Amino acid sequence: MVKFLEKVGGYARDVLESAKYIGQGMGVVFDHMRRKPVTVQYPYEKLIPSERFRGRIHFERPKCISCEVCVRVCPINLPVVDYEFNKETKKKELNSYSIDFGVCIFCGNCVEYCPTSCLSMTEEYELSVYDRHELNYDDVALGRLPTRVTDDPVVRPIRELAYLPKGVMDGHLEDPGSRRAGELPEEIVARLRPADHSSGTDANKKEGE
């Protein structure tokens, strides 16, 4: 009789434990039933890149002074700068400029150290081609500005879940005119400036005492 009761008790515990785990799993299922799918229906839907997204590099030829700083700071010496020295003006004249995006690691060093800001990062990331030699962009191809995801009439922009406001689980519900994820440089400076000012005033007070 005792063994029978022990078996019944063990069976009941197993049933309760199984019911608990099933309930936990169904709780997750019911929680996700209230959400919309997070799969992006590319190419009809595209994620909105953040403000500091490192995409295809844009080149402005009139600003380039052929200083080759971009080549020196590049980890793989990637940009190819072809120029001639004009003896009359004593300046370098650019003939051609090219970057092979099949080799580029998109580190952004060339953009950061360019003295004339002729290089900039765009939000273009669709660089798929059938021939890898087509990824070698010359100054004409680099000078083309891509269409922004938010301005493309045939694409539905979606914001990534990591950048959605608290409590919002659907990137489709974001307002069309909402800003991108991340802070702009001037916003970072404005946020840090009050802290620097307060620390400076505290230091001045201590020196005065």
Curated annotation (Swiss-Prot):
- Role description: NDH-1 shuttles electrons from an unknown electron donor, via FMN and iron-sulfur (Fe-S) centers, to quinones in the respiratory and/or the photosynthetic chain. The immediate electron acceptor for the enzyme in this species is believed to be plastoquinone. Couples the redox reaction to proton translocation, and thus conserves the redox energy in a proton gradient.
Ranked from the top, the taxonomy reads: Bacteria, Bacillati, Cyanobacteriota, Cyanophyceae, Gloeobacterales
Give the reaction(s) catalysed: a plastoquinone + NADH + (n+1) H(+)(in) = a plastoquinol + NAD(+) + n H(+)(out); a plastoquinone + NADPH + (n+1) H(+)(in) = a plastoquinol + NADP(+) + n H(+)(out)
The principal localisation class reads membrane
Q: Which GO terms describe its molecular function?
A: 4 iron, 4 sulfur cluster binding; iron ion binding; NADH dehydrogenase (ubiquinone) activity; quinone binding
Which biological process terms from the Gene Ontology are attached to this UniProt entry?
Answer: photosynthesis, light reaction
Give the E.C. number(s): 7.1.1.-
Question: Could you describe the subunit structure of this protein?
Answer: NDH-1 is composed of at least 11 different subunits.
Identify this protein by name. Answer: NAD(P)H-quinone oxidoreductase subunit I
